[in-house]
Amino acid sequence: MDNELFEKAPIPEAYFSLAMPVVLSMLVTLVYNMVDTYFIAHTGNTDMMAGVPLTAPVFTVMIALGDIFGLGGSSVISRLFGQHRFADGKRLSAFCFYAAIATGLLILVLGLAFRDPMLALLGATDDTWQYASDFYTLIIVGSPFIIVSMTPSNLLRTEGHAVQSMIGSVAGTAVNIVLNPLFIHGFGWGAAGSAGATVIANICTDAYFVWFTLRHSSNLSIDPRTVIDRARRRLAVTAREVGSILAIGIPSAITNLTQSVGIVMINLFLLPYGTDAVAAMGIALKVIMIAVLVFVGFAFGAQPLIGYNYGARNMPRLRGILRFSYLFLSLFALVMTVVLSLSDRLLMGFFIEDATIITLGAGMLRVQLLSLVCVAVVMVTTCTFQSAGKAVGAFVLSISRQGVMLAITLFVGSRLAGYQGVIAAQAIADLLTAIVAVILFVVMLPELRSRKAR
């Protein structure tokens, strides 16, 4: 473990060493998602194009479940490492790994048992049923591998292995990009081929993470004996430790889930204004998502650094890290706002050629960009609460931006300003959530000022 990086390296160096690999990994994954859609679209089969996206919420749930043990575990383990309790960190890392496997197996059993009701709930019709079913079935079969992949990718960063975490994620994405056209077009497996490529890619990612942990990790473990008290024949993990992991992991999972919920809510409120408005907002939100993913990468890439120094009670360094995080991401968001605003029509044109939708979407994009700085503030604050184990603050922010706050602003905005109110709802929700984040952070400040070194 690179204690020098966490304890003594200049803050910008430590910050970017941990965060940049996460940013790059997220951007590569974003590229894959676009490429995956491209390969499905080029089958020319509209029923397949409609059927496969119906299963997207299932994949989102799997990622969220993986985050419970990945982000929740990394928060607790980072703080333990800061206290130099390396044996406890190793024990909990093994618990998180096998808890993710158990969760994946549970999803596999339940997902197959309730396949038909789930497909109906997801909106599969007679035309799309077969394609949705093919994709859903293979994704469910691969759920243990998909869920598990999220755990070591986060835990490795607690030791400073951010680059190796990125390599595992990027390698899986590369395998997916290679296998997708081969399985879909070369072998003619269609939707099943796309799902199969995704599962195999996650298996490759898991294999790399297991190999790296066994060969190069000094304070993480996947040895089941690490987490079993053989003398008492029970798990060597306390209810309090599990509760600490879940207290941070569940809000992280909720954050992922509310992203999908938020998009659905916006679409429902836009439907009365026509499909062009829905399509335009969909593209505008894709552009915004690119910026948000970069923010997430920078903010949460630094999570092990924040957690380690909080656990070590190194308050001067922690305050310096937080100042740098807020300043850097806020300035970065400001630059992104200007650049994307000046390129609004060009960016819309990358996704569609319809002039009406480009005009609508460009206006929507400019409105959404007004709150990018607020999004940056929310991301850094959320990461701070998660890193410090502040479950209440993390939970409040996880349900706010694209959950409770968005629901309120959509409802009020649509009634007060109609179409324009719906368009501005997310930006206003971002502003309100940022205000809540600042208030919660101010409440936390006395502890940051008074917390003494051990």
Positions of the model-derived regions?
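N-terminal transmembrane alpha-helices
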Residues: E7-Y38, H42-T43, P57-G72, V76, ...
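Helix-terminus/linker motif at the lipid-water interface of multi-pass membrane proteins
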Residues: L27, V31-A50, L119-D126, L182-W189, ...
